[in-house]
Amino acid sequence: MPTLLLGAAIPFGTIAYTLFIFLLLLVMLRKFAWGPLMGIMKEREEHVTNEIDAAERSNAEAKKLVEEQREMLKQSRVEAQELIERAKKQAVDQKDAIVAAAKEEAESIKASAVQEIQREKEQAIAALQEQVASLSVQIASKVIEKELKEEDQVKLIRDYIKEVGEAR
């Protein structure tokens, strides 16, 4: 005789059989499908976690490398600036040395020129004195007309010019 369940006429054997099959299916699903599926899900979760950890480590390493590169770039800039400053100082020192050498050479040339001018002046004065003496002798000889010998006149004029030169 069929048993009524919730107002439907379903035989009890069918209900028991369906329940047994359902439970058997659950056990089989748990053993053969749910377990492996959960294992795969667990493995996938671990894999994703490992990938995230690896990505975080890679990100941290990349940040560290970027910071190191920035430091190296900063250090390179500092070294380049120091090199430029040293080159500028060396150029200024070299310029000062060249200017000093040029001034020294100019002073030497100037002193040499002054000495040359002095020597030329002395030679010109000596030549002029000779000419003046010679002219004086000629004039005196015409004026005196041989009262004194020519040698005595030259000596007399030279002595006179010498005295005049020393008096100045």
UniProtKB/Swiss-Prot annotation:
Keyword Endoplasmic reticulum: no
One Gene Ontology CC term in the entry: plasma membrane
Keywords: ATP synthesis, Cell membrane, CF(0), Hydrogen ion transport, Ion transport, Membrane, Transmembrane, Transmembrane helix, Transport
InterPro entries, alphabetized: ATP_synth_B-like_membr_sf, ATP_synth_b/b'su_bac/chlpt, ATP_synth_F0_bsu_bac, ATP_synthase_B_chain
Localisation: Cell membrane
Gene Ontology MF terms: proton-transporting ATP synthase activity, rotational mechanism; proton-transporting ATPase activity, rotational mechanism
Topology within the bilayer: Single-pass membrane protein
Top-level taxon of origin: Bacteria
Main location class: membrane
Transmembrane keyword on record: yes
Spans through the membrane: 9-29
Subunit structure: F-type ATPases have 2 components, F(1) - the catalytic core - and F(0) - the membrane proton channel. F(1) has five subunits: alpha(3), beta(3), gamma(1), delta(1), epsilon(1). F(0) has three main subunits: a(1), b(2) and c(10-14). The alpha and beta chains form an alternating ring which encloses part of the gamma chain. F(1) is attached to F(0) by a central stalk formed by the gamma and epsilon chains, while a peripheral stalk is formed by the delta and b chains.
Free-text function comment from the UniProt entry: F(1)F(0) ATP synthase produces ATP from ADP in the presence of a proton or sodium gradient. F-type ATPases consist of two structural domains, F(1) containing the extramembraneous catalytic core and F(0) containing the membrane proton channel, linked together by a central stalk and a peripheral stalk. During catalysis, ATP synthesis in the catalytic domain of F(1) is coupled via a rotary mechanism of the central stalk subunits to proton translocation. Component of the F(0) channel, it forms part of the peripheral stalk, linking F(1) to F(0).
NCBIfam families: ATP_synt_b
Family: Belongs to the ATPase B chain family.
Name of the featured protein: ATP synthase subunit b
Organism: Bacillus cereus (strain AH187)
Encoding gene (name): atpF
